[in-house]
């Protein structure tokens, strides 16, 4: 049995992105659903869907239980292994042919490397140590390139939304 579903979700997403998986299955909870909605809205994942699978209970072989899972589709971007200093040099035919070869290389599949959009996920407030902040104390993640996800009285919000609304809450995790 999983006691901390948020840590489990973050660990599953982190491990799947490290091995470049296309999607990952996560146990469904309302909190996990809200975090997945925020990750999709902020552009860290492509999309998600709710899967319902029938499973036979171990204790009662005749009854069936519904296992609801979140299927999260991870997002990657292509990183090119080329030097872009060639782009501003088109003065002779050789440079033009080099430029055309560079364009062919960029369109082709040579030199492409999938890099995850999520660099890291970190659980901040844990079941043993809850961390609460108000909107004035809330720091920025990597100078604004990442987000904090907070549990507030108005629901699950990002740090930017919480600052805009002027409310604080429990800092669940950080994503960058």
From Swiss-Prot:
Name the family.
Belongs to the universal ribosomal protein uS8 family.
> Which organism does this record belong to?
Stigeoclonium helveticum (Green alga)
What the entry lists under Pfam families is as follows: Ribosomal_S8
Where primarily located? plastid
Alphabetically, the GO molecular function entries are: rRNA binding; structural constituent of ribosome
| One annotated Gene Ontology cellular component of this protein | chloroplast
Q: Which PROSITE patterns match?
A: RIBOSOMAL_S8 (PS00053)
Keywords from the named record: Chloroplast, Plastid, Ribonucleoprotein, Ribosomal protein, RNA-binding, rRNA-binding
| Highest taxon above the source species | Eukaryota
Q: Name one GO biological process term.
A: translation
InterPro entries, per this entry? Ribosomal_uS8, Ribosomal_uS8_CS, Ribosomal_uS8_sf
Quaternary structure (record):
Part of the 30S ribosomal subunit.
* Name under which the protein is recorded: Small ribosomal subunit protein uS8c
Q: Quote the function comment for this protein.
A: One of the primary rRNA binding proteins, it binds directly to 16S rRNA central domain where it helps coordinate assembly of the platform of the 30S subunit.
Report the subcellular localization.
Plastid, Chloroplast
